[in-house]
């Protein structure tokens, strides 16, 4: 279950950023999760809530944005690979235009803290 370790890393990252910016409270956190990470957003959100207890993050709203897989194929196709075309147990993807596997993945592998909204000291 790599969701736990990823949620822990997110919590540590947000706490570190909040402390560096003299926050008294974290109000909202937006996280981007790429489809190819195979992370379950519902599990991540649950673990973020649990790991936030007793910290500056407790009570914060977590917004999880799923980033679709975008490819650039040798055939010239540039765009999104639809989620229903992905096998979530083994993320083998192919170009929807030519069926090929020779492409560059432009998006969908990331897991980033995109935005943190804090309450600062007066």
From Swiss-Prot:
Keywords: Metal-binding, Nickel, Zinc. InterPro entries: Hydgase_Ni_incorp_HypA/HybF_CS, HypA/HybF. GO terms for molecular function: nickel cation binding; zinc ion binding. Signal peptide: none annotated. PROSITE patterns: HYPA. Ni(2+) binds at residue 2. The keyword DNA damage does not apply. GO terms for biological process: protein maturation; protein modification process. Zn(2+) binds at residues 73, 75, 95, 98. It holds the Pfam family HypA. Involved in the maturation of [NiFe] hydrogenases. Required for nickel insertion into the metal center of the hydrogenase. Belongs to the HypA/HybF family. This is Hydrogenase maturation factor HypA. It comes from Methanothermobacter thermautotrophicus (strain ATCC 29096 / DSM 1053 / JCM 10044 / NBRC 100330 / Delta H). The lineage of its organism: Archaea, Methanobacteriati, Methanobacteriota, Methanomada group, Methanobacteria.
């Amino acid at each position: 279950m790599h969701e736990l370790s990823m949620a822990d890393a997110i919590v540590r990252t947000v706490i570190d950023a909040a402390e560096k910016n003299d926050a008294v409270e974290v109000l909202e956190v937006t996280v981007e999760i790429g489809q190819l990470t195979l992370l379950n957003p519902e599990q991540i959100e649950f673990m973020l809530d649990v790991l936030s207890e007793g910290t500056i993050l407790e009570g914060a709203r977590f917004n999880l944005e799923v980033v679709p897989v975008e490819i650039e194929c040798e055939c010239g196709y540039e765009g999104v690979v639809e989620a229903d075309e992905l096998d979530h147990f083994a993320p083998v993807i192919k170009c929807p235009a030519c069926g090929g596997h020779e492409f560059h993945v432009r998006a969908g592998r990331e897991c980033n803290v995109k935005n943190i909204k804090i309450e600062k000291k007066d």
